[in-house]
Amino acid sequence: MDISQKIQKLYEQTGISPEVHDFGEKIEKSLKERFDKIDKMAELNQLKVIHAMQEARVNAECFNYASGYGYNDFGRDTLEKVYANVFHTEDALVRPQITCGTHALALTLSANLRPGDELLSIAGKPYDTLEEVIGIRPSTGSLAEYGVIYNQVDLLPDGSFDFDSIKKAIGEKTKLITIQRSKGYQTRPSFSVDQIGEAIAFVKKIKPEVICMVDNCYGEFVEEKEPSDVGADLVVGSLIKNPGGGLAPIGGYVAGRKDLIEQCAYRLTSPGLGKEVGASLGVMQSFYQGLFLAPTVVAGALKGAIFAANVYEKLGYAVVPDGKEERHDIIQAVTLGSAEGVIAFCQGIQAAAPVDSYVTPEPWAMPGYDSDVIMAAGAFVQGSSIELSADGPIKEPYAVYFQGGLTWAHAKLGILMSLQKLYEKGIV
């Protein structure tokens, strides 16, 4: 028995039928050229991260445990230099005290907006959890409660920026403009770094002093550039997504202009204290090592997303991005057209997990969302979406959002298992 036969036998032991396995093999063979390009991008970004670490003179002392106030936490301070080097920014704030991506965004917005200022989204409605942060849906402590005005410019029908409407929307009170790089729970295309750069340049011509913030979640290390390379004043993300490499157990980051990062630090801790406090509590090695591995991990996730797109496109489902499009984040949307399809897909992803594979996910009323949501994530870190995961709101158009996979082999297994569940239920 050769290795290919042994692999197929192991797939059968995990519940993958020969029909599903053979279908997947044909799709994978057609993607060799795409996968080679992804490996080259990973090599480029790996070298970029190593260079950033060398420039910051990372050493073993950076991994030491720090507690209490965290004064002179060498590892924490050096890591923030590394992030500033990676993103080519003046400064960065990278902390375990930033609990998630939504927290990082809420922190950045509340730190840099004052009563009477206007926050303008030029990419339409933001991600669901930000609706309560902003006050689109009433919530205690929202920006609206503190007198921040919110306005948005919807995207054009093709998913591109509506430059005419953006020009009209920018006014005297417009203080901060936000761009969400990834699609979130939408079926629009995600933005490329170049598209974001074009929008920022357009905005800065109209009002040079306006702050341009990019929600960078799911986009780090997908391209050779980051939004901070094309004019973003602030880029914001989560360490349990791409830059944590699957190892960071918690955390978020903000990178950008020094004066704006200072505002974020004062909001995170206290006026007068800022970046000086906030002990790292023993997580530094996982933060450094996760960042080091991130380009390779992101490459595996990208291969999984492209594989998923091609598998489901071949079966006649609408997928965003499609099987041939260039990638700008790690998320793959598949419109399955029914609640049963979304649930079966997510149950397949869960069944492929190394952790909690025996659990059957069901839709539930998740805080921050306006409909029931189903989430599949048999992850080592709870909620980690750089690990193999899938989720989606149980509402029209019944799209599921697949992302992650610390390795390509695991991402492949997840997609095959999702297809197996749909096959068993007679949906495909």
Locate predicted features:
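Short helix-loop-beta junction
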Residues: 85-89, 141-148, 354
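Conserved C-terminal alpha-helix-loop-beta "cap" of PLP-dependent enzymes
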Residues: 313-427
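Structural motif
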Residues: 91-94, 117-120, 175-176, 209-212, ...
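Active-site-flanking structural segment that lines cofactor/substrate pockets
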Residues: 57, 63-93
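Conserved PLP-enzyme active-site core in the AAT-like
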Residues: 3-13, 17-24, 28, 32, ...
